[in-house]
Structure formats: C-alpha cells, structure tokens
Regions:
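Carbohydrate-active catalytic/glycan-binding domains of CAZyme proteins
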Residues: 1-147
Length: 147
C-alpha cells in the first residue's frame, strides 16, 4: 500500500505500508517537486487514479507565486517517477466562485456511458479572491470529465 502526501517545502512524497496501512515508512525521493510554472509555490493534495493498462494519473494542487492555485496532473507507469503535464486541468476563473483558486480536489468515478470512456466528477475547493491577498470566500465546486 502506497500513501502520497505533501511535505511542506519539498512537494509530494510517498510512503509504503507492509501491514495493510497501520504503519508507513517514507520512501526516498520526492514524487512531485514544486518546480514548475504552475506549482512553483507548492505542490500538495495528491489524488491518484489507476488508468487501465497505462499506469497511474495523479491530480494535485499547485500554487504559483501570485497566490493562484490550479489543479494539475501527472502520469506514472510505476507510481514513483511522475511526468507532469504541461497545463492545468482546472484553473481559476471558471465562475465567480473560483476566480482565484482551485485546490483540494477529490475524484469520483461516475457510471460509464454505453461504449464510452470512464467518466469522473471532480469536487474541489474554490476561492473567489474577494479579500486582500487573493483570499476570500471558499466554496465547494465540481466539474466533470472523461479520463
């Protein structure tokens, strides 16, 4: 069993459990370093989805320097080495409720459409940025997509 979490100042790390999740031992290395255009402030809140026959997809939140938070994604064949995708999958600005930040997501699988690709609903925290410092009112929002 592998657990992914954020370690402040380092990015997303992982730990393994050999006892069904009662205890974990941190693995060496960083899975997602906060070193890209969209996550240079921090990378946090990982959510992992297994892709049939293709490894894993991680969704995670990233802060850029301007107090903006986007939802980002990376893929991996083994769960250890991750390749970041070049653009966010969800960015602020979709509506007045998420004008400044999109973060802390949770992915839910929806019933498949007949002969269609899997469908997912992403529930996430959204901030309107109406207060000083890109702060403001936080709400729960959602979006749907096929993976």
């Amino acid at each position: 069993l592998r657990l992914y979490c954020c370690r402040r100042g380092h990015g997303i790390i992982s730990a393994l459990s050999g006892d069904g999740g009662l205890t974990f031992q941190q693995e060496a290395g960083v899975r997602i370093a906060p070193d890209g255009q969209w996550d240079q402030g921090t990378a946090f809140a990982p959510e992992i989805v297994r892709i049939a026959g293709a490894g894993y997809r991680m969704y995670y939140a990233g802060y850029s320097t301007a107090g903006r938070a986007d939802i980002l994604t990376a893929t991996s064949a083994d769960g250890l080495r991750w390749e970041k995708q070049s653009r966010p999958v969800l960015s602020p600005g979709g509506g007045p409720w998420d004008a400044a930040k999109c973060s802390e997501m949770c992915l839910l699988r929806l019933p498949d459409r007949e002969l269609g690709a899997p469908r997912y609903r992403m529930v996430y925290e959204a901030c309107d940025g109406t207060a000083p410092g890109h702060r403001g009112v936080w709400r729960v929002a959602s979006a749907t997509s096929c993976v």
